[in-house]
Amino acid sequence: MPFSSEQFTTKLNTLEDSQESISSASKWLLLQYRDAPKVAEMWKEYMLRPSVNTRRKLLGLYLMNHVVQQAKGQKIIQFQDSFGKVAAEVLGRINQEFPRDLKKKLSRVVNILKERNIFSKQVVNDIERSLKTESSPVEALVLPQKLKDFAKDYEKLVKMHHNVCAMKMRFDKSSDELDPSSSVYEENFKTISKIGNMAKDIINESILKRESGIHKLQSTLDDEKRHLDEEQNMLSEIEFVLSAKDPSRLNKNVDEDNIIPTYEVGDGDDDDDDGDNDDDDDDDDDDKNYDDRSNDSNYGVTNISTTDKKNEVVEKTDSEHKNSTHNPSDNQFGMKRTHDMIGHDDANDIPEKKVHLDSKTSEDGTFNSEDGHYELDIEGHVGAQTDEGVENSGGVSSSIQDLLSKLAN
């Protein structure tokens, strides 16, 4: 029967800590003596797997010990040579992984191999040398108590897991062999039920331990997260203090303070003052506009008053003109008075004023003086007049001059 690596791995995974189980697997391997080198290499590869637990590796060690001893008794030297080439490396590695109680069992196996001269002296010396190497640095680490508790539970979980797998395989095999047509079907079913109940108990116990281990790991993880946050806060505080106390940064801040201009404290907000100034300017403009309107209104009133006065002058002139036609003797007096008034007005620097009445000759009532020229057009003022009215035009001129003098004053 040819050697099968899958079948060999299955036998290693199903080994139990009993003489019967180990002897059965050993007999099968002895039949594969032609493939002894392959068996030794597969055994080495299995024993060095990280996924294989220490208990399963211890059972593999027991199997190797049984095979080489039986091979020596049967003078099958192939297994001694093949396992002798890999024994030192494998035993040295698993010794670092084993806990203290398993290390004692490993040492007892090595002593048996040495006493019975299963391997050559060179192989035995190599094995002893590998066992004297320093233990794994993991054992020297200081672990939290929660992790230590989890490690203890984990060892139990590993053992229970293999028991669970073995019980499940046993239950599956028994259920496959159950034949309903058999006369002993009920008895076989009772046996299978017992195996199933045993498997259920082992699985439930394993589940409880795993839940407890997960809780411990989660608690440890929460503690580590809290410590991580605290350390990050400390790091931020240190960086802030170093940045604030940096001499180059302090000098830079001093220079910036010197550059920044200083301002005197005011009574109020500048914006409010500007608004007040704007309001004052608006008030001034309103006052100015009001004054202008007042002046305009006064000017209008003055013009109205002047117009009224002119109308009064015209009415008075007409009246006096009518009177002057009846009192021709007043013409000379009026002419003389007018002349005197004109001289008086010149002395007071009264502006020159001309009233054009479009008279033609001095005979028609035109009066000429050195400083002023007044012309009276009787015909334009009162219409067509008689000759008598023309002769008395001097009186009208005198009255007009008198009124003009009053207006000038």
Curated annotation (Swiss-Prot):
Its main location: nucleus. PROSITE patterns: CID. GO terms for cellular component: chromatin; nucleus; site of double-strand break. Residues 1-135 form the CID domain. Residues 307-323, 337-363, 370-380 have a biased composition (Basic and acidic residues). GO terms for molecular function: DNA binding; RNA polymerase II C-terminal domain phosphoserine binding; RNA polymerase II complex binding. Interacts with PCF11, RAI1, RAT1, RPO21 and RBP2. Involved in transcription termination by RNA polymerase II and in regulation of Ty1 transposition. This is Regulator of Ty1 transposition protein 103. It comes from Saccharomyces cerevisiae (strain ATCC 204508 / S288c). The lineage of its organism: Eukaryota, Fungi, Dikarya, Ascomycota, Saccharomycotina. The gene is RTT103.
